[in-house]
Amino acid sequence: MPYLKFLVAAIAGSCMLVSIAKAEELPAPIQMLANQGLTIVDTFPAPGGLKGYAAEFQGQAIALYLTADGEHVIVGNLLNLEGRDIAADPLYQLVTGPAQEHAWQQMERATLLQDGDADAPRIIYTMTDPNCPYCHRFREAAEPWIAAGKVQLRHLMVGIIREESPAQAAAIMGSPDPAEALVNHINRRERGGIEAIPRFVRIGEPVIRANHRIMRELNLSSTPIVYYRDENNHVQVIRGMPQPQQFEAIFGPRP
């Protein structure tokens, strides 16, 4: 596994997880990985004399297993007889779940493009670049639910794909009706999208800069990124264009 070589060369990017390293002295192999950039979040039970550690690195949950002699650490998946990773539930509870709730809260506090009925029963957050074709496809896929008043998309507009993306994103956010501007842009995408009118760009630029900071804080670098709550009210995230079989899980029953 190329984990260790990769970890040495990078710096951890997450601040919201509480590390147990500050509260207790870690075994040497675990401390070695903490020194290389991992955030050691907590421990969890593991079989075979191992001790599990839930860690986070650049937004990704990682399972570590300390051997009984305290001299070695195993990094990666540990499967049971059914082929299930025994760390799946602990990592979600200790790392992934809290991180995704944190991301949801950051989205709630951001300046967003509200696309759909304000009273819609289902809210979905998505990071959108004006020139991202998969963002366009996601918006088009959501249209039946938006038109029926079942879903409101809340777009965190960013500009990362093309040179003109930041100005177009700012123009959309600075326009009198950002939701209408986004739909017009998508409908005109084959002709280059909407014009980046300077007065609208000036209004929208601070929003786009703030949204880029959120992307960096969440260790995200692509679009679309979709956040939604599942039937258990847990925050789920999909990176990239969701598959059609995922639509009802995201948007709810088809109208």
Describe every region a protein language model picked out.
Residues 1-8:
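Bacterial N-terminal signal peptides that target proteins for export
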Residues 234-238:
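Structural signal for short hydrophobic segments within the conserved structured cores
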Residues 168-183:
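Acidic, Ser/Thr-rich peripheral helices and adjacent loops at domain boundaries
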Residues 190-193:
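Acidic-aromatic/histidine active-site loop/patch
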Residues 11-14:
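Repetitive helical segments and hydrophobic/amphipathic motifs
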Residues 6, 17, 22-165, 184, ...:
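Extracytoplasmic thiol/disulfide redox context detector
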Residues 231:
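Acidic beta-to-alpha connecting loop that harbors the catalytic carboxylate
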